[in-house]
């Protein structure tokens, strides 16, 4: 992995007009316009999900004949989308080739724009990590500054690792706000001033004209990361819950993101749980985020500590320079502080009550808890589990697993890379045969 030096701001080549409709840019489908059939894509999806496959594996996992499988494999080999790898020994002495994605097909970039940071990753087409970088940043600085920095860093990551920008075929971007996925724009984001309907795709496309650019909500992107490399791998029906500055859910239905009719499915942070409750940045009162997101946890704990209920938290507050964070509440809880334990349990209860409704409605196989606040640990997780089990139907929770993310803060960039790959392959289908 190359080292990244300070990147000088690059002048934008002009801001696209916001008065014109903005559509997902389609630079090119697969490199060299290698369109594939829906049958071929099904084989590609299997390899992406499970790893290398033999012909016999493809026959087992599909309804296709061996003749059709052979035809699809030959076509994918000719298009250089997959490659034949080492032969595997089977009982009886017969050896069979395995097939995997061709990493040399191009590069994919994943960008996770958080409220206070940006994380970037470049991988090859097989999903192999080539370089990763992260740095603090404020999304409140606005799209021109943030996207300029993102693109500058991507250029630097490519050049310092001898990767051609012309081979960058896809860029997936996750942002912490509602996204109209059909056009790739952020819509009325509560914590992203200046981003409303800003042409993110067109701006990034000016820097990387050979790349297909796709934008989605950060929680959807994290859910993609979790089902590709995390706890949810090979789980077709899953809910990923991010608990951080805000709270959101990414819904995976039959292996795909469910976005709803306008792209805002899963925005559970703005479900009312405490009426009349505190005013939320969205304009409503008593939203889940006002009682269970990171800032809300810290604020509730601080007010109680200042009222004399927790000397430990008050000491942490003064030690940090009159700042109390959700992680400080976790530290106090681990030291046995009764107030901190109470605040975490109540927050978990609020979250669990909302998730119980989702479990009854959607019946997922797994709920994965991620985001910075998940670092509060098992006390939070057990409170969420208890509420879900208490308020959900027994049949809906019979096989339900509620677990922490296995890939933690990397879920966003991993998911963004897979978002780019999903988009490229989805626009590369040339026929249904």
Q: Could you tell me what each predicted segment is?
A:
Residues 218, 244, 416:
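Active-site glycine-centered loops adjacent to acidic/histidine catalytic or metal-binding residues
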Residues 84-86, 212-217, 251:
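General beta-strand structural signal in soluble alpha/beta enzymes
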Residues 108-112, 168-172, 238-242, 248-250:
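Short glycine-aspartate micro-motif
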Residues 231-292:
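Glycine-rich phosphate-binding loop of actin/hexokinase-like ATP-binding domains
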Residues 129, 186, 257-258:
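Hydrophobic "anchor" residues
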Residues 1-87, 91-93, 98-167, 275-276, ...:
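ATP-binding/phosphotransfer module of carbohydrate and carboxylate kinases, centering on a glycine-rich
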């Amino acid at each position: 992995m190359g080292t990244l030096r300070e990147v000088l701001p690059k002048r934008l080549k002009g801001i696209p007009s916001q008065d014109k409709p903005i559509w997902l840019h389609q630079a090119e489908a697969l490199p060299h316009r290698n369109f594939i059939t829906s049958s071929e894509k099904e084989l590609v999806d299997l390899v992406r999900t499970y790893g290398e496959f033999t012909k016999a594996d493809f026959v087992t996992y599909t309804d296709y004949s061996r003749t059709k499988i052979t035809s699809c494999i030959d076509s994918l080999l000719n298009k250089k989308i997959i490659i034949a790898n080492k032969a595997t020994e089977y009982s009886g002495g017969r050896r069979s080739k395995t097939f995997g994605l061709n990493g040399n097909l191009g590069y994919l970039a994943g960008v996770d724009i958080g409220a206070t940071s940006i994380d970037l990753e470049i991988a090859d087409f097989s999903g192999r990590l080539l370089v990763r970088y992260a740095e603090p940043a404020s999304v409140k600085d606005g799209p021109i500054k943030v996207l300029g920095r993102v693109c500058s860093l991507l250029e630097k990551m490519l050049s310092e690792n001898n990767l051609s920008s012309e081979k960058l075929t896809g860029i997936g971007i996750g942002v912490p706000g509602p996204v109209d996925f059909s056009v790739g724009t952020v819509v009325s984001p509560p914590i992203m001033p200046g981003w409303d309907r800003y042409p993110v795709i067109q701006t990034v496309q000016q820097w990387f004209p050979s790349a297909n650019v796709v934008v989605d909500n950060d929680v959807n992107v994290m859910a993609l990361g979790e089902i590709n490399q995390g706890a949810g791998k090979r789980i077709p029906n899953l809910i990923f819950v991010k608990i951080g500055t805000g709270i959101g859910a990414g819904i995976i239905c039959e292996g795909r993101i469910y976005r709803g009719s306008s792209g805002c499915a899963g925005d559970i942070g703005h479900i009312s749980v405490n009426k009349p409750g505190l005013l939320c940045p969205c304009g409503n009162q008593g939203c889940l985020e006002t009682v269970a997101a990171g800032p809300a946890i810290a604020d509730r704990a601080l007010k109680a500590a200042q009222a004399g209920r927790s000397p430990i938290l008050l000491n942490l507050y003064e030690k940090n320079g009159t700042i109390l964070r959700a992680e400080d509440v976790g530290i106090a809880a681990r030291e046995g502080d009764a107030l901190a334990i109470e605040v975490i349990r109540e927050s978990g209860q609020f979250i669990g009550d909302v998730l119980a409704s989702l479990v009854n409605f959607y019946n997922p196989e797994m709920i994965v808890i991620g985001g910075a606040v998940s670092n509060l640990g098992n006390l939070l997780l057990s409170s969420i589990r208890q509420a879900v089990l208490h308020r959900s139907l027994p049949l809906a929770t019979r096989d339900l697993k509620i677990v922490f993310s296995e890939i933690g803060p990397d879920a966003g960039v991993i998911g963004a890379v897979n978002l780019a790959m999903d988009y490229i392959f989805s626009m590369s289908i040339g026929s249904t045969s």
